[in-house]
A protein has these predicted regions:
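The catalytic core of metal-dependent phosphodiesterases that act on cyclic dinucleotides
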Residues: 74-198, 319-322
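Conserved alpha-helical "signature site"
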Residues: 146-409
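Generic alpha-helical propensity signal that fires on short helical segments
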Residues: 4, 27-29, 34-35, 41, ...
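Short, structured coil/loop segments at alpha-helix boundaries
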Residues: 34-36, 64, 80, 88-94, ...
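Bacterial c-di-GMP phosphodiesterase EAL domain
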Residues: 2-81, 86-96, 272, 295, ...
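Residues in intrinsically disordered, low-complexity segments of regulatory proteins
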Residues: 16-19, 50, 124, 200, ...
Length: 409
């Protein structure tokens, strides 16, 4: 039954990031064209089967009101939260179901319109609040942030400052790194839904982004611990920019290898741990410690891991590694600061990878387009892309949930 119910819904996702810029939860978008035919109990059972209850929360943002009503009537499931839109609380029947769900221990997250705070009545049952700022509130938050930074630089107290950002809440739609830093670092917000990727990268328009220092160090430590080739390969894949530079290094004339290296596995086997460690140590002095880049890297890796899962049933290990490279390099231009075509052509990648990234053609293109659609925030787009590529919704949903669950552990 869990397999059939996952075939009847469309799922999308938005990562939730904490003050350390690590994944602390996932907002799962749930939609269906036929809400009356989706059994809420079976849907929760299917999600629970694929989501480890001891990991980060899975926040269900359910579009059809009928399905949301049905989910409110179900017993709580470990690790699963339910988003409650404030406008629906005006319905007395719905509000009554919310109160009853609270009595049963269901964690619920109130969500309002920009600038809105939960009412006293909502405060009685909400587990968290998902808020957003109006333009005026965003400006006020930036002013407060500026005064806080000025006071810190001068070693003085900033005085009484009122920020519109509430401690312990989730926030969505924060459009700049300054707002994110104010919310997470200064005001102790619980988490941020989504990430201001374009604005973070804009700060690097005149300087080169470097691989993450903590991920380079983790690779060095893995080598020192004599971890397996598979583990080293997986860790390398957690850093898209480092993976790209490693393949450039493995194919450099100075290294003198006798053949093209078109995969991380080939490169690791050809170079060996000793030379790899030396090369990694050369990266460390220039490595980045900017935590605001971490969600950007992690999102790119999530796309690649989802593609791996989508391909899992149909390809052998070597081809699955190609699929991963296709995903991880599909946005590498954002980190390199150069056109995607030029970046891809610098590497001797298999034609299937290059054609999917640059031409949206070939056998890997459907997986890439579906993985990109899943992060779009639009269930309509997801449904249309899956239909265009004749990819069964149940298969896509299971790949998504398994990838998110593995990332949340």
């Amino acid at each position: 039954m869990s397999h059939s119910v996952l075939s009847s819904v469309t799922l999308g996702y938005e990562p939730i990031w904490d003050r350390w810029r690590k994944l602390c939860g996932v907002r799962l978008l749930v939609d269906t064209d036929t809400p009356d035919t989706v059994d809420a109990r079976h849907l929760l059972a299917a999600l629970s089967e694929l989501w480890p209850g001891s990991s980060h929360p899975l926040l269900l943002s359910v579009r059809p009101a009928a399905l949301l009503h049905g989910l409110l009537a179900q017993p709580p499931r470990p690790g699963i939260w339910l988003e409650i839109p404030d406008p629906q609380l005006s319905d007395a029947l719905f509000a009554g179901r919310v109160r009853k769900a609270r009595q049963q221990g269901l964690p619920m997250v109130w969500r309002g319109v920009p600038g809105q705070a939960p009412s006293n009545a909502a405060q009685a049952w909400l587990h968290k609040a998902l808020r957003s700022l109006t333009p005026q509130e965003a400006l006020q938050a930036l002013r407060v942030s500026l005064r806080q930074h000025q006071a810190s630089a001068m070693g003085t107290a900033s005085g009484p400052l009122h920020s519109p950002v509430a401690a312990g809440s989730l926030y969505e739609g924060l459009a700049s790194p300054a707002l994110v830093e104010h919310a997470l670092d200064r005001q102790s917000a619980w988490g941020v839904v989504g990430w201001p990727t374009e604005e973070v990268l804009h700060a690097y328009r005149f300087k080169q982004i470097q691989p993450a220092r903590h991920l380079v160090l983790a690779l060095v430590q893995a080598i020192d611990a004599d971890e397996s080739l598979e583990t080293i390969e997986h860790r390398m894949g957690d850093e898209p920019l480092l993976t790209y530079r490693f393949l450039r290094y493995a194919n450099s004339a100075g290294l003198g290898l006798l053949r093209d290296i078109d995969s991380v596995r080939q490169g690791l086997m050809a170079i060996g741990y000793t030379r790899l460690r030396t090369w990694l140590m050369e990266q460390l002095p220039h490595a980045s410690s900017d935590p605001n880049l971490d969600p950007i890297r992690a999102t790119q890796v999530l796309r690649a891991r989802i593609m791996e899962r989508l391909a899992d049933a149909g390809v052998e290990d070597g081809l699955r590694r190609e699929v991963f490279l296709c995903g991880i390099f599909s946005q590498v231009d954002l980190l390199l600061g150069e056109p995607l075509g030029a970046a891809i052509l610098h590497l001797p990648l298999p034609g299937r990878v290059a054609s999917a990234i640059l031409g949206q053609t070939g056998p890997y293109a459907p997986w890439l387009e579906v993985a990109a659609a899943l992060e779009s925030g639009s269930t309509r787009v997801i449904r249309e892309v899956c239909k265009a590529h004749q990819m069964p919704p149940g298969e896509v949903n299971r790949a998504l949930l398994r990838t998110l669950a593995a990332s949340a552990l």
